[in-house]
Amino acid sequence: MQRFLVVNDMKIIFATGNSGKLREASEILDEGFELVTPAQVGITEDIPETGKTLRANSLQKAQYLFERCGCDCFADDTGLEIDALGGEPGVHTARYAGEDKDFNRNMDKVLYELSVLESSGKMAQEYGLQTRPASRKARFKSVITLIFKGETHLFEGTLEGEISRAKSGNGGFGYDPIFIPDEYPGKTLADITEEQKNEISHRGKALRAMAKWLKENA
């Protein structure tokens, strides 16, 4: 079985082809870790993610990678949960507007659906019906599955906030231009610096928990 653990310099495979996730993880994990992509060890096919929950998807991806290479590895699955949409996109976050994972279209769909809910509420009020304003409250959740020395460990992180009314900012990736974190009122994740985002992000919290565990148990 090939493994990548080397004393104080830990090489570990991150089951992602997403350059944004890889950059974020590399910046959050300190110099004691070196991330390796599946492509770098010859795994170029799409890693399956057919689970019905974030945990299931994260576990499925990590197990697939471990079975293919037998290496220390980890995978994450992240979902955006919007209260007014009943928790959607949730596990469908990356493919909310289609299988092509087009995040501009994903964001457009979210903004449209929330605007429709708000319009419906206003119309109902005009007819004297009692309604509550559509909530824009939302949260990101990340679940990381680490397979280390053949054993499986889970780490989670959550970021609370709300959905903006329009895209804003040029930074980040994914849904960042429409997510306003509670820590930065009036600013989306794409408006703040990468350093500021990494300090509060859902994935950052899960990654730091994983890094702490590895340093204590490697």
Predicted features along the sequence, with ranges:
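Anionic-ligand binding patches
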Residues: 7-13, 20-218
